[in-house]
Amino acid sequence: MAAAGEVVMLGGILLPLLLVVAVSGEPPPISRRSFPEGFIFGTASSSYQYEGGAREGGRGPSIWDTFTHQHPDKIADKSNGDVAADSYHLYKEDVRIMKDMGVDAYRFSISWTRILPNGSLSGGINREGISYYNNLINELLLKGVQPFVTLFHWDSPQALEDKYNGFLSPNIINDYKEYAETCFKEFGDRVKHWITFNEPLSFCVAGYASGGMFAPGRCSPWEGNCSAGDSGREPYTACHHQLLAHAETVRLYKEKYQVLQKGKIGITLVSNWFVPFSRSKSNIDAARRALDFMLGWFMDPLIRGEYPLSMRELVRNRLPQFTKEQSELIKGSFDFIGLNYYTSNYAGSLPPSNGLNNSYSTDARANLTAVRNGIPIGPQAASPWLYIYPQGFRELVLYVKENYGNPTIYITENGVDEFNNKTLPLQEALKDDTRIDYYHKHLLSLLSAIRDGANVKGYFAWSLLDNFEWSNGYTVRFGINFVDYNDGAKRYPKMSAHWFKEFLQK
């Protein structure tokens, strides 16, 4: 696997592409026409990061409302998503921007508490929330943009957190399923692509381990400033319940709605690519374990009905088990896989822990770093975790192809950030050459994987707009369009938006 991490990624189609870059200093040209006929290009967003209108239109509080207001110290600039990019009021402007760019599709998420303010169907449906999403969906279709709808992008109802600890309880499976069915009933005549969960890994690890940097902010006391939690058990429990809720919801959709509505349903996962720190067997094994704990945690159940062997051996009784019926239900429970890729790491082997302070962050016995022998794996972006490594994109996509039966894939997020430099004049802030270079090289890498047989059907850039970036608040900007938070969230196209418009011309 050292060879796979360091040599194979230069093989096949990618080698001549990289040679062109090396010789000329510029990547070869690429456009929509480089990709297969019918390939979908879009941009992506999420409700809490974009909408604002936190207390408008009958919306109930989510765990992110509670988290940002009770723990502003956990957000880099002590901000929140009360207003965010104000898409609750400016959605027509956003759709106009997309139409002008020429995108095919828009991936957005529905705020659970805008539909069911109390989290459960028994608490009543909020018709104002239904109207907002109907208006957004209809506006998209009017302008020729397909809606790709995520049902859960981390903003679970605070009412269910208070009632039974949210995703730590199996009770959430039925409440989630009823919420999803409400969406199928209300929007499924027009929505043809559903995503049950966005990045379960990020929600479960950052919310229940890793110092509790995401809502609901739980972790073991020795791992961070958390009021409660167990970093060695709760991440696995929460994600187990997400997988079960996913499987139950997919069965419901396929049995009751798919034939009539003619839609597809899947789940979005995130993974880095991992390059062995050296060619030693221990480091090659560590890179594989890192993939198991980030991607296999979900792909193995979806394909094989059980967690990866490495997880079962290392996590042992802290890892929940599927019953035989659950295993059969989850196996194959998707029409497509959404895959998010941003960055890569080196992986080195770690000795077994002492068994006292168990945590997801050490269970894989892999030391993840972006620097080897003083040299970073690639240029660093604004976020401390994001190093630019386009080759890893190809490697990850081909790894899914080769290890999980070449499923239909949509790249549901890919992007890079810059610092929010408030001293820059607007015209300077719109110059984002690094982002253009990032997208250009990552699209070349993806195209190489497609030409090597990966069944990828679409690509969504993260993100359409600058937005609330979770624990980073507004200190970084991921958008291809600039949002002026000091002037009514006015939108201005960055250079990357112009680049994409040219790229997308048919």
Swiss-Prot record:
This is Beta-glucosidase 13. GO terms for biological process: carbohydrate metabolic process. A beta-D-glucoside binds at Q49, H153, N198, E199, Y342, E413, W462, E469, W470, F478. Keywords: Disulfide bond, Glycoprotein, Glycosidase, Hydrolase, Signal. The active site is at E199 (proton donor), E413 (nucleophile). GO terms for molecular function: beta-D-fucosidase activity; beta-galactosidase activity; beta-glucosidase activity. InterPro entries: Glyco_hydro_1, Glyco_hydro_1_N_CS, Glycoside_hydrolase_SF. Glycans are attached at N118, N225, N357, N367, N421. Disulfide bonds join C219-C226. Belongs to the glycosyl hydrolase 1 family. PANTHER family: BETA-GLUCOSIDASE 9-RELATED, GLYCOSYL HYDROLASE. It is an enzyme of class 3 (hydrolase). It catalyses: Hydrolysis of terminal, non-reducing beta-D-glucosyl residues with release of beta-D-glucose. It comes from Oryza sativa subsp. japonica. Pfam families: Glyco_hydro_1 (PF00232). Residues 1-25 form the signal peptide. Its EC number is 3.2.1.21.
